[in-house]
Amino acid sequence: MNKIDHKKLQAKPEEEDFSGKYENSNFVAKYLVENYFKSVEKLIALTKDVNSAHEIGIGEGRSTMRLKHLLTNFSGSEFVEKLVPVAKKNNPELNIFQESVYELKSKSNSIDLVLLLEVLEHLDHPEIALEEIKRVSKKYLIVGVPNEPLWRILNISRLKYLKDLGNTPGHLNHWSKKEFKKVIEQNYGNVIAIESPIPWTIILAEKY
């Protein structure tokens, strides 16, 4: 795989604000987030013989906090260096470190379950990222992205990001459920199950 020059990427995660991403006090937002994590938990329950798990792109580690009780030998990583200490503080018992999804530090075929939640839509090269994830993955991938165009429609309905037609800042990729299933099948493996909590698509796939 060709080395990615991060300085030339359109994605600028270090400039985005991920604070409070899963901590919204709004009733509707809270309800949607709860459904989101219930769906992730359902997919985790479908996996077998998972003795190691790693979440990529954890931000402040909020999703990691929600899921760590379900997984053994669980670790996490984040590209933005200033967020790594925050994620460590939120998950002091876990191995949290800095890495790029394009240059993962794990050995090939070493992780039973990789999680990538609300990351792929931010990437310049999602296919290259999936290729690298496939390298380190031994069995499973759980990956979630916004379900388009529903995501943008809901943003417009609440008068958000109107000048960008409802596109959330930092979102470079937009997939419907059908389109995203095809991306995963072409770049990772067999799709075992799909959850569609509004307004996301979350897929459990097994490596080819």
Residue spans of the language-model regions?
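A short, conserved alpha-helix within the catalytic core of class I
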Residues: L123-E132
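Short aromatic-enriched loop/helix-cap "lid" or pocket-rim segments at secondary-structure transitions
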Residues: R152-S157
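Hydrophobic adenine-recognition pocket in adenosine-nucleotide-binding enzymes
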Residues: V119
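Conserved beta-strand signature within the Rossmann-like core of class I S-adenosyl-L-methionine
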Residues: K138-P146
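Short "lid" loop at the C-terminus of a central beta-strand within the Rossmann-like core
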Residues: N147-W151
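Conserved N-terminal segment of class I S-adenosyl-L-methionine
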Residues: M1-S108, L130, L159-Y188, A193-Y208
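A conserved beta-strand element that flanks and buttresses the S-adenosyl-L-methionine
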Residues: L115
